[in-house]
């Protein structure tokens, strides 16, 4: 790489999250036309500077999405780092001629990277790996808060049925995952 590349911000334990967030705010947001031109340039010529500008202009999006996963008890800096990997994948595969903005496309790659990190980080004993179990893992807390915001511990039968129906999983899977996530699982 040449010397005229961006000085990309790093997220370290020493600098802290606040310093990183201050750094990424310095990168300008792109308007639709500039984003399109940079993406086409990256796609057709492989111009790394164009790709870097696309990445740096979307680092705030990664941080915002990662903060939505704070409830899983994992280090935020690691979730942001994983989200950044997803952002880079999105830039690599982005097709600007389809008419969507990069943020719309990248959001799915960022979320997928963060969710995969969370799944890798949680013990396989704690969670499952089937599609239904992943759906349950990532949606149970949100649905519980919607249905019974003040409920602690085990769910009432009607809440279990409601969640099972909404997520298309068995009632036993809901009860089991709820116990796993609340730390009440019995071996």
Please name every model-derived segment:
Residues 146-186:
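Long, charge-dense, solvent-exposed interaction surfaces that engage phosphate-rich ligands
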């Amino acid at each position: 790489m040449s010397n005229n590349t961006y000085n990309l911000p790093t997220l370290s334990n020493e600098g802290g999250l606040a310093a990183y967030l201050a750094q990424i705010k310095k990168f300008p947001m792109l308007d639709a036309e500039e984003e399109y031109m940079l993406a086409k340039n990256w796609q057709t010529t492989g111009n790394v500077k164009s790709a870097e500008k696309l990445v740096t202009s979307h680092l705030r999006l990664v941080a915002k999405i990662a903060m939505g996963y704070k409830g899983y008890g994992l280090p935020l800096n690691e979730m942001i780092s994983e989200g950044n990997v997803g952002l880079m994948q999105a830039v690599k595969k982005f097709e600007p001629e389809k008419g969507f903005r990069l943020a719309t496309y990248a959001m799915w790659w960022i979320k997928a990277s963060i969710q995969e990190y969370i799944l890798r980080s949680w013990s396989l004993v704690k969670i499952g790996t089937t599609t239904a179990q992943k759906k349950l893992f990532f949606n149970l807390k949100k649905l519980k808060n919607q249905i019974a915001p003040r409920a602690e511990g085990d769910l009432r039968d009607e809440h279990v049925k409601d969640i099972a129906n909404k997520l298309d999983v068995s009632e036993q899977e809901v009860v089991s995952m709820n116990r796993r996530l609340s730390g009440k699982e019995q071996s």
